[in-house]
Amino acid sequence: MKADYNTYYYIAASKHFLTQEEPLEEILREKTEHFIANNKSIDFWIFDSTKLNAHSPNEIKTLQKTFFFPTILIISSNKKFITWLKLRLRYIFTDKIQLAIKL
């Protein structure tokens, strides 16, 4: 049986940079409040490379290994949201990934 793949978009950056030098918590809190106020489903997920475990998607674990430092990934099915984050944050990497699971 062939798995269905879904396209997700992501940003990746140093964990230290996103948690210590950028207002990531504030940005995500504002976006979450916006989603709730507009009755939209929250469609982003945060993966911390230092906290991945056996239950984490294999594709995410493989992607995290491409970075040589502790990394935060923010993944969404909403390309506009990732573009918005890219404009708000500095020193980040963006791309897309095909996942055989639905987040």
Curated annotation (Swiss-Prot):
Say if the entry is tagged with keyword DNA-binding: no
Name the UniProt key words of this record, in alphabetical order: Chloroplast, Plastid
Per the record, the gene is ycf54
Taxonomy of origin reads: Eukaryota, Rhodophyta, Bangiophyceae, Cyanidiales, Cyanidiaceae
Q: Under what name is this protein listed? A: Uncharacterized protein ycf54
Tell me the compartments it is located in.
Plastid, Chloroplast
Query: What's one GO-annotated cellular component?
Result: chloroplast
Pfam families per record: Ycf54
- Record's InterPro entries? Ycf54, Ycf54-like_sf
- Where would one find coiled-coil regions in this protein? none
Q: Does the keyword Isomerase apply?
A: no
Q: Which family does it belong to?
A: Belongs to the ycf54 family.
| Gene3D superfamilies recorded | Uncharacterised protein family Ycf54
Disulfide pattern? none
